[in-house]
């Protein structure tokens, strides 16, 4: 056997295990055993999750369990389980808290301010029967075939409501999430959180920097450190609000002042609400860059069905990363720009499919 034949034989022997491994994965991927595919992907080591809305990444069972546990801190929650027609005609059906929205969660203080008729529409979260508890959990899942973008954007956070204003509950959902990620081999996560004020059990305001300290304390716990998952945060603004520019100024400064915890600014909210168009924020960002250096931008864009140039306009804002980017393929010039460029698109497999 000459040298070339020996070399060929050597490489065949060397590569056989890799070929066999590739065939093995292809067999699982293309087969009918979906459980085997899920199990394989679950235990496969992973780098990181760069696009994660913390309050949108909590299983309903976790929300229920952790919300009840907050009684130890003095928090009590109620949820709306029936409609008794307590209000007259002419209410705002498009408000953040529409009267007809079931399973909206409120604090004990909010409950105390209701009249007797509306109090009868609510039950303590701890007192739900099995049917109500199941419906409560389904209310924050996309579990019906007709549920999609509208259900998600118009009811999910509106229902969570008071639960998202508790900074300790936020920290405990973080720990639950990190534990789940550690179990499937994740090593890094970036969570998107808001910068609104939080509240204590007596209704006292807990400012954002105090909430950051609560997150720091949670991450410093030994059992959390031992998980081996690094967590950082982006501060997000709701881009279509009338005061979105002021929100942007605030979170930009907070990210600059808390580099140990915060790594960037994001803009979220329905992109099909045209009041949040990207170019709206260009003057504000130019102003902010003159005051603060090194603040990174990772911004939702291209999360709509219609062809448009929102991804390009978002890159113009200075974003390094694009969230979703679903309609990027309809913008040929920007596709060419990004083909060899330094930009990253965060592909969100589940939400891109469902929303």
Predicted regions and their residues:
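Short amphipathic alpha-helical "recognition" segments used for binding
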Residues: 8-10, 350
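N-terminal signal peptide c-region/cleavage motif recognized by signal peptidases
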Residues: 16-20
């Amino acid at each position: 056997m000459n040298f070339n034949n020996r070399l060929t034989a050597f490489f065949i022997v060397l590569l056989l295990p890799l070929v066999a491994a590739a065939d093995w994965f292809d067999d699982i991927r293309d087969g009918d055993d979906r459980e085997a595919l899920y199990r394989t992907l679950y235990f496969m080591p992973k780098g990181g999750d760069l696009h994660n809305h913390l309050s949108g990444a909590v299983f309903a069972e976790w929300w229920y369990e952790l919300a009840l546990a907050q009684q130890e801190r003095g928090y009590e929650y109620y949820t709306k389980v029936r409609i008794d027609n307590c209000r007259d005609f002419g209410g705002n059906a498009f408000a953040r808290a529409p009267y007809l929205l079931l399973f909206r969660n409120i604090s004990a203080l909010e409950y105390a301010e209701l009249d007797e008729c509306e109090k009868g529409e609510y039950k303590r979260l701890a007192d739900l029967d099995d049917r109500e508890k199941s419906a409560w959990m389904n209310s924050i899942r996309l579990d019906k075939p007709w549920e999609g973008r509208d259900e998600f954007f118009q009811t999910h956070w509106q229902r969570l409501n008071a639960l998202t204003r508790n900074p300790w509950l936020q920290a405990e959902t973080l720990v639950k999430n990190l534990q789940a990620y550690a179990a499937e081999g994740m090593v890094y996560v970036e969570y998107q959180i808001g910068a609104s004020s939080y509240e204590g059990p007596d209704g006292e305001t807990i400012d954002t920097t105090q909430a950051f300290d609560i997150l720091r304390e949670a991450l410093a716990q030994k059992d959390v450190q031992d998980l081996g998952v690094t967590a950082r945060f982006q501060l997000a603004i709701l881009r279509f609000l009338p005061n979105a520019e002021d929100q942007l100024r605030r979170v930009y400064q907070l990210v600059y002042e808390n580099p140990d915890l915060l790594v960037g600014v994001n803009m979220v909210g329905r992109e099909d609400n045209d009041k949040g168009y990207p170019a709206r924020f260009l003057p504000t960002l130019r102003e902010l860059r003159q005051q603060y250096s090194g603040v990174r931008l990772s911004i939702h864009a291209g999360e709509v069905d219609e062809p448009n140039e929102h991804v390009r306009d978002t890159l113009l804002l200075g974003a390094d990363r694009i969230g979703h980017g679903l309609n990027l393929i309809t913008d040929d010039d920007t596709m060419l720009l990004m083909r060899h460029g330094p930009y990253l698109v965060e592909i969100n497999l589940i939400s891109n499919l469902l929303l």
